[in-house]
Amino acid sequence: MSTPAATTDPVVERTTANSSTSAALVVSRARVSYPDGPDIRVVLDDLELSVEPGEIVVISGESGAGKSTLLTVAGLLRRPDEGEVTIAGIATSEMSERQRTAVRREHLAFVYQSANLLPSLTAVEQLELVGHIRKERGTAVRERALATLASVDLTDRANQLPSQLSGGERQRVGIARALMASPSVLIADEPTASLDPERAAIVAGLLADAARTHRIATIVVAHDTAALVHADRHLRLEGGRLRPM
Protein backbone atom coordinates (compact mmCIF):
# COMPACT_ATOMS: atom_id res chain seq x y z
CA MET A 1 0.00 0.00 0.00
CA SER A 2 2.99 2.25 0.52
CA THR A 3 3.85 4.65 -2.26
CA PRO A 4 7.25 6.07 -3.24
CA ALA A 5 8.22 9.35 -1.57
CA ALA A 6 6.81 12.28 -3.47
CA THR A 7 9.57 14.60 -2.36
CA THR A 8 12.53 15.22 -4.65
CA ASP A 9 14.67 16.53 -1.82
CA PRO A 10 18.28 15.44 -2.52
CA VAL A 11 18.84 14.43 1.10
CA VAL A 12 15.80 12.14 0.98
CA GLU A 13 16.91 10.65 -2.33
CA ARG A 14 20.46 10.08 -1.12
CA THR A 15 19.51 8.38 2.14
CA THR A 16 16.97 6.18 0.40
CA ALA A 17 19.53 5.03 -2.15
CA ASN A 18 22.14 4.28 0.52
CA SER A 19 19.85 2.20 2.76
CA SER A 20 20.34 -1.57 2.84
CA THR A 21 17.77 -2.52 5.49
CA SER A 22 14.48 -4.21 4.63
CA ALA A 23 12.79 -2.88 7.78
CA ALA A 24 10.18 -0.18 7.33
CA LEU A 25 11.15 1.40 10.66
CA VAL A 26 14.49 1.32 12.44
CA VAL A 27 15.22 3.18 15.67
CA SER A 28 18.92 2.84 16.41
CA ARG A 29 20.70 3.74 19.66
CA ALA A 30 18.07 6.33 20.53
CA ARG A 31 18.68 8.30 23.69
CA VAL A 32 16.28 10.82 25.23
CA SER A 33 16.66 12.49 28.62
CA TYR A 34 14.81 15.19 30.55
CA PRO A 35 15.80 17.49 33.41
CA ASP A 36 14.42 16.13 36.69
CA GLY A 37 15.14 18.76 39.33
CA PRO A 38 18.91 18.84 39.80
CA ASP A 39 19.24 15.50 38.01
CA ILE A 40 18.81 14.16 34.48
CA ARG A 41 16.24 11.43 33.89
CA VAL A 42 17.10 9.10 31.01
CA VAL A 43 13.86 7.95 29.33
CA LEU A 44 15.29 6.12 26.31
CA ASP A 45 18.75 4.65 26.73
CA ASP A 46 20.44 3.42 23.54
CA LEU A 47 17.08 1.97 22.53
CA GLU A 48 16.89 -0.31 19.50
CA LEU A 49 13.76 -1.18 17.53
CA SER A 50 13.26 -2.59 14.04
CA VAL A 51 9.86 -3.34 12.49
CA GLU A 52 9.42 -5.15 9.18
CA PRO A 53 6.67 -4.46 6.62
CA GLY A 54 3.49 -6.21 7.76
CA GLU A 55 4.83 -6.87 11.25
CA ILE A 56 2.83 -5.93 14.36
CA VAL A 57 4.84 -5.01 17.45
CA VAL A 58 2.96 -4.36 20.69
CA ILE A 59 4.77 -2.32 23.35
CA SER A 60 3.73 -2.16 26.98
CA GLY A 61 5.29 -0.69 30.11
CA GLU A 62 4.58 1.10 33.35
CA SER A 63 3.17 4.61 33.35
CA GLY A 64 6.07 7.01 32.87
CA ALA A 65 8.31 4.37 31.31
CA GLY A 66 8.68 6.44 28.13
CA LYS A 67 6.20 4.80 25.76
CA SER A 68 4.81 8.11 24.51
CA THR A 69 8.33 9.46 24.10
CA LEU A 70 9.26 6.42 22.03
CA LEU A 71 6.24 6.93 19.77
CA THR A 72 7.07 10.60 19.21
CA VAL A 73 10.65 9.67 18.31
CA ALA A 74 9.59 6.84 15.99
CA GLY A 75 6.92 9.09 14.47
CA LEU A 76 9.40 11.90 13.75
CA LEU A 77 7.49 14.22 16.08
CA ARG A 78 10.61 14.88 18.12
CA ARG A 79 14.32 14.26 17.66
CA PRO A 80 16.19 11.94 19.98
CA ASP A 81 19.12 13.50 21.80
CA GLU A 82 21.26 10.85 20.13
CA GLY A 83 20.60 8.08 17.64
CA GLU A 84 18.97 7.53 14.26
CA VAL A 85 15.45 6.93 13.02
CA THR A 86 15.11 5.40 9.56
CA ILE A 87 11.70 5.31 7.87
CA ALA A 88 11.19 3.30 4.68
CA GLY A 89 14.93 3.33 4.10
CA ILE A 90 15.26 7.07 4.74
CA ALA A 91 17.67 8.11 7.50
CA THR A 92 16.36 11.25 9.17
CA SER A 93 18.89 12.38 11.79
CA GLU A 94 20.64 14.86 9.50
CA MET A 95 17.46 16.26 7.97
CA SER A 96 15.93 19.66 8.52
CA GLU A 97 12.50 19.82 10.15
CA ARG A 98 10.98 20.54 6.75
CA GLN A 99 12.52 17.37 5.34
CA ARG A 100 11.43 15.30 8.35
CA THR A 101 7.89 16.62 7.97
CA ALA A 102 7.89 15.57 4.31
CA VAL A 103 8.97 12.03 5.27
CA ARG A 104 6.37 11.87 8.04
CA ARG A 105 3.55 12.94 5.73
CA GLU A 106 4.60 10.51 3.03
CA HIS A 107 5.31 7.41 5.11
CA LEU A 108 3.68 7.63 8.55
CA ALA A 109 0.14 7.50 9.90
CA PHE A 110 -1.19 7.61 13.45
CA VAL A 111 -4.15 6.16 15.35
CA TYR A 112 -4.86 7.46 18.84
CA GLN A 113 -7.13 6.48 21.73
CA SER A 114 -9.62 9.05 20.46
CA ALA A 115 -10.09 9.41 16.71
CA ASN A 116 -10.53 13.21 16.96
CA LEU A 117 -12.76 13.38 13.90
CA LEU A 118 -13.86 16.72 12.49
CA PRO A 119 -17.45 17.13 13.74
CA SER A 120 -18.83 18.72 10.56
CA LEU A 121 -17.55 16.05 8.13
CA THR A 122 -19.15 12.70 7.40
CA ALA A 123 -17.12 9.52 7.64
CA VAL A 124 -16.34 9.47 3.93
CA GLU A 125 -15.50 13.18 3.93
CA GLN A 126 -12.95 12.61 6.73
CA LEU A 127 -11.11 10.26 4.37
CA GLU A 128 -11.55 12.44 1.31
CA LEU A 129 -9.83 15.26 3.18
CA VAL A 130 -6.74 13.07 3.53
CA GLY A 131 -6.79 12.44 -0.21
CA HIS A 132 -7.06 16.15 -0.97
CA ILE A 133 -4.17 16.94 1.38
CA ARG A 134 -2.16 14.39 -0.61
CA LYS A 135 -3.05 16.31 -3.80
CA GLU A 136 -5.44 13.64 -5.08
CA ARG A 137 -8.27 14.95 -7.22
CA GLY A 138 -11.43 13.84 -9.01
CA THR A 139 -13.87 11.02 -8.41
CA ALA A 140 -11.02 8.61 -7.66
CA VAL A 141 -10.66 10.20 -4.21
CA ARG A 142 -14.23 9.34 -3.20
CA GLU A 143 -13.95 5.88 -4.71
CA ARG A 144 -10.80 5.15 -2.69
CA ALA A 145 -12.37 6.65 0.44
CA LEU A 146 -15.43 4.42 0.09
CA ALA A 147 -13.26 1.36 -0.56
CA THR A 148 -11.19 2.13 2.53
CA LEU A 149 -14.32 2.50 4.66
CA ALA A 150 -15.49 -0.84 3.29
CA SER A 151 -12.23 -2.40 4.48
CA VAL A 152 -13.18 -1.50 8.07
CA ASP A 153 -16.82 -2.58 7.62
CA LEU A 154 -18.31 0.92 7.54
CA THR A 155 -19.88 1.05 4.08
CA ASP A 156 -23.34 1.71 5.51
CA ARG A 157 -22.03 4.50 7.78
CA ALA A 158 -20.18 6.49 5.12
CA ASN A 159 -22.54 9.47 5.21
CA GLN A 160 -22.88 9.69 8.99
CA LEU A 161 -21.40 12.49 11.09
CA PRO A 162 -19.17 11.58 14.06
CA SER A 163 -22.02 12.40 16.46
CA GLN A 164 -24.08 9.68 14.76
CA LEU A 165 -21.41 6.99 15.20
CA SER A 166 -20.63 4.79 18.17
CA GLY A 167 -17.24 4.95 19.87
CA GLY A 168 -16.09 1.82 18.08
CA GLU A 169 -17.28 3.15 14.73
CA ARG A 170 -15.45 6.44 15.26
CA GLN A 171 -12.27 4.52 16.02
CA ARG A 172 -12.73 2.48 12.84
CA VAL A 173 -13.06 5.73 10.87
CA GLY A 174 -9.79 6.79 12.51
CA ILE A 175 -8.13 3.60 11.27
CA ALA A 176 -9.57 4.10 7.77
CA ARG A 177 -8.31 7.68 7.77
CA ALA A 178 -4.82 6.44 8.62
CA LEU A 179 -4.99 3.83 5.85
CA MET A 180 -6.07 6.51 3.38
CA ALA A 181 -2.58 7.98 3.77
CA SER A 182 -1.01 4.77 2.34
CA PRO A 183 1.60 4.63 5.13
CA SER A 184 4.72 2.52 5.34
CA VAL A 185 4.52 2.73 9.14
CA LEU A 186 1.43 2.94 11.37
CA ILE A 187 1.77 4.07 14.98
CA ALA A 188 -1.17 3.35 17.30
CA ASP A 189 -1.26 4.72 20.85
CA GLU A 190 -3.76 2.85 23.06
CA PRO A 191 -6.22 2.50 20.14
CA THR A 192 -8.64 0.27 22.06
CA ALA A 193 -8.30 1.67 25.58
CA SER A 194 -11.65 3.51 25.57
CA LEU A 195 -13.66 0.62 24.09
CA ASP A 196 -15.52 -2.27 25.68
CA PRO A 197 -13.97 -5.73 25.14
CA GLU A 198 -16.17 -6.62 22.16
CA ARG A 199 -15.48 -3.39 20.27
CA ALA A 200 -11.80 -3.50 21.29
CA ALA A 201 -11.47 -6.94 19.71
CA ILE A 202 -13.05 -5.69 16.47
CA VAL A 203 -10.77 -2.64 16.25
CA ALA A 204 -7.64 -4.66 17.09
CA GLY A 205 -8.56 -7.21 14.44
CA LEU A 206 -9.07 -4.53 11.80
CA LEU A 207 -5.68 -2.99 12.62
CA ALA A 208 -4.03 -6.38 12.29
CA ASP A 209 -5.79 -7.16 9.01
CA ALA A 210 -4.72 -3.79 7.57
CA ALA A 211 -1.12 -4.25 8.67
CA ARG A 212 -0.82 -7.66 7.05
CA THR A 213 -2.89 -6.98 3.94
CA HIS A 214 -1.06 -3.77 3.06
CA ARG A 215 2.36 -4.71 4.51
CA ILE A 216 2.35 -1.83 6.98
CA ALA A 217 4.90 -1.92 9.80
CA THR A 218 2.74 -1.35 12.88
CA ILE A 219 3.63 -0.30 16.42
CA VAL A 220 0.87 -0.51 19.01
CA VAL A 221 1.23 0.78 22.56
CA ALA A 222 -1.36 -1.19 24.52
CA HIS A 223 -1.96 -3.24 27.63
CA ASP A 224 -5.23 -4.97 26.78
CA THR A 225 -5.41 -8.52 25.48
CA ALA A 226 -7.25 -7.42 22.32
CA ALA A 227 -4.04 -5.98 20.88
CA LEU A 228 -1.76 -8.72 22.23
CA VAL A 229 -3.72 -11.45 20.43
CA HIS A 230 -2.49 -10.15 17.07
CA ALA A 231 1.10 -9.27 18.01
CA ASP A 232 4.03 -10.77 16.16
CA ARG A 233 6.19 -9.48 19.00
CA HIS A 234 5.37 -8.16 22.46
CA LEU A 235 8.02 -5.89 23.95
CA ARG A 236 8.18 -4.15 27.32
CA LEU A 237 9.78 -0.73 27.74
CA GLU A 238 11.74 -0.80 30.97
CA GLY A 239 14.84 1.07 32.06
CA GLY A 240 14.93 2.96 28.79
CA ARG A 241 15.18 -0.17 26.66
CA LEU A 242 12.84 -2.66 25.00
CA ARG A 243 12.82 -6.20 26.34
CA PRO A 244 10.97 -9.21 24.88
CA MET A 245 7.99 -10.54 26.83
Regions found by a protein language model. Give the residues of each.
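ABC ATPase NBD coupling module
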Residues: 41, 92-109
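Conserved ABC transporter NBD signature motif
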Residues: 83-91
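Short coil-to-helix segment of the ABC ATPase nucleotide-binding domain corresponding to the Q-loop/switch region
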Residues: 121-130
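Conserved ABC ATPase signature
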Residues: 161-165, 169
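Conserved catalytic motifs of ABC-family nucleotide-binding domains
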Residues: 182
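Catalytic Walker B motif of ABC-type/P-loop ATPase nucleotide-binding domains
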Residues: 186-189
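Helix N-cap at the start of a conserved alpha-helix in ABC-type nucleotide-binding domains
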Residues: 197-199
